[in-house]
Amino acid sequence: MKKIYTCFCTDVIHEGHLNIINEAKKYGDVYVGVMTDAAMVKFSRFSTISFEERIDLVKGIEGVKEVLIQDEVMYDKIVDILHPDYVIHGDNWKTGPMKAIRDNVVKLLSAYGGEVIDVPYTYNENVKRVDAQCKEKLSMPEYRRKRLKQLLKICPIVKTIEVHSGLTGLIAEKTIVENDGAFNQFDAMWISSLCDSTAKGKPDIELVDMTSRFRTIDDVMEVTTKPIIFDGDTGGLTEHFVYTVRSLERMGVSAVIIEDKTGLKKNSLFGTEVQQTQDTIENFCEKISAGKKVQLTDDLMIIARVESLILERGMDDALTRAHAYVKAGADGIMIHSRKKDPAEILEFCDKFRAENKDTPIVVVPSSFNTITEDELSAHGVNIVIYA
């Protein structure tokens, strides 16, 4: 019997998938690939069910001879292992970013006489409704809130882009780039206080109140599904911060980043050119601990932003603070620098990783923007924010 292969990236089997299977059965034994979470998030949406559950879904389809694991977007490994006579897919992959996948398959199969079968894509109300329901599920707080932690487990580095409105959120949500056979998209969104304030014509001094900031979150959440990292500035008074944490958790935000400064907030990139006061380690640890204590779930991350390098307090101070903040309950450390050379950031990461292998590190390479994600990841960085 000839072998025919197809790959599914879905949480729900609908008639479109069944049409593919039924057409495939006409040509031979049907092998179905299930794409891993890590591969899916490179060009598609995040799954709402586990990888194992998706495998079981496909195993339950009548006519499927074997289920295979596809751990890359491109089909090179699968074709090398299975050597299928045919690869079948909906004809929606003839255009857009997915065309690169089809071109890759055609090239692989042509090497030994295999063929691609394009089946008319199933456009109807039932399929549209299923797709819409999956998207709605992804946008629900209980699913969105935990997604950043899930991404940290499967992505070498979580790519995050700044958003400050529903429109910029849609751009972050829908942008997919293909380059030399590799797909990329943003994994998460950063709601920056600087951009939120600027969009409202206000200075970046924590003038925009939390009620207004929460409205921005609502606008973004209404039209997106990706996890949100919230710029919490200093967090304000500890007594106020605990209520901010409760609100963010309830809304479905995945992380809040607070910086260890006090008084009237000034943009970090001003450095020592303006007066900025760093909080004491004891006070900031108390704020972190208070925020963690009021959480109802473990999903929301409180990430401590260390400003020692910005304020020229030295590497030892930065490391001392970072370790203290983690001990106080911080789920991650953000280290910032206004130097154009990434050397001090990389030095911090290396020294921090020497003592702490697991706590996520966040960087924002606004000034040292010549460094690559691969370089950052090699030094232990887990989240990169473009803002």
Where are these regions (language model features)?
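Alpha/beta enzyme core
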Residues: 141-366, 370-382, 386
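Nucleotidyltransferase catalytic core that binds NTPs
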Residues: 1-141
